[in-house]
């Protein structure tokens, strides 16, 4: 296997892992995260990709409150990612 094939396989594995992490206990979050990974994740900078992955470590009730506008995330990077996802994903 060439280095290019190895890189492609690693990207596919990472994308599959991300999509699995996007499957939440709340459908409202699933319909935001899964399309975002499919349509926008690859276009993000490495820093923003890490920020998105950090966002996925949050608890569902907290994430739901941020995305529904009930609360504002105090972490500026995470808040910017929430806003980007809301802008990119039309629900």
UniProtKB/Swiss-Prot annotation:
Q: Does the keyword Electron transport apply?
A: no
Q: Which of UniProt's keywords are assigned here?
A: Chaperone, Cytoplasm
Briefly state the protein's biological role.
An FAD assembly protein, which accelerates covalent attachment of the cofactor into other proteins. Plays an essential role in the assembly of succinate dehydrogenase (SDH, respiratory complex II), an enzyme complex that is a component of both the tricarboxylic acid cycle and the electron transport chain, and which couples the oxidation of succinate to fumarate with the reduction of ubiquinone (coenzyme Q) to ubiquinol. Required for flavinylation (covalent attachment of FAD) of the flavoprotein subunit SdhA of SDH and other flavinylated proteins as well.
What Gene3D superfamilies does this protein's entry cite?
Flavinator of succinate dehydrogenase
What family does the Swiss-Prot or TrEMBL record give for this protein? Answer: Belongs to the SdhE FAD assembly factor family.
Q: Which organism is it from?
A: Colwellia psychrerythraea (strain 34H / ATCC BAA-681)
UniProt xrefs under InterPro entries: SDH, SDH_sf, SdhE_FAD_assembly_factor
Q: Its encoding gene is what?
A: sdhE
GO BP annotations of the record are: succinate metabolic process
Q: What is this protein called?
A: FAD assembly factor SdhE
Gene Ontology terms, cellular component aspect?
cytoplasm
